[in-house]
Regions:
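Non-catalytic interaction/Regulatory regions outside core domains
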Residues: 1-29, 33-128
Length: 128
């Protein structure tokens, strides 16, 4: 079991530091949502499943091209951007970060990576 309150506190801190983050979600590598902080009208369970599939596809393409391991995957639109990061915890996790259109991709990526680093110790210290 994960400390959902601690995970949500990391999300709240990230969203306080960058108010243009419209969604932060942590999900298992098989696409089940663990925790989310969102101002979007979206089904978190569906987003978790699709985000993990998209990131897994990016990782597979990277392997097929004989590139290094994929660090993240992105989706860029006029309405905002999405960054998907695999967190290499004891059990791999997916962090989904969505930024509104005024937040450029580089800044979104910075905040998503920082959030992933803050989550890692919480994920490795799971409660039985």
């Amino acid at each position: 079991m994960y400390d959902v309150a601690a995970i949500e506190a990391v999300f709240a801190q990230a969203r306080q530091r960058q108010s243009s983050l419209s969604l932060l979600m942590l999900s298992t590598a098989d696409g089940r949502s663990i925790a989310e902080a969102s101002s979007l009208d979206a089904d978190g369970r569906r987003i978790a499943a699709m985000a993990n599939s998209f990131l897994t596809l990016g990782e597979t393409v990277s392997r097929e091209l004989k590139l290094s391991e994929a660090d993240y995957a992105t989706i860029c639109t006029r309405m905002g951007n999405v960054v998907l990061i695999r967190i290499a915890a004891a059990r791999p996790m997916t962090l989904t970060a969505v930024g509104r259109s005024e937040l450029n991709l580089a800044v979104l990526l910075f905040h998503a990576r920082e959030c992933a680093q803050r989550l890692l110790p919480l994920l490795d210290a799971r409660t039985p």
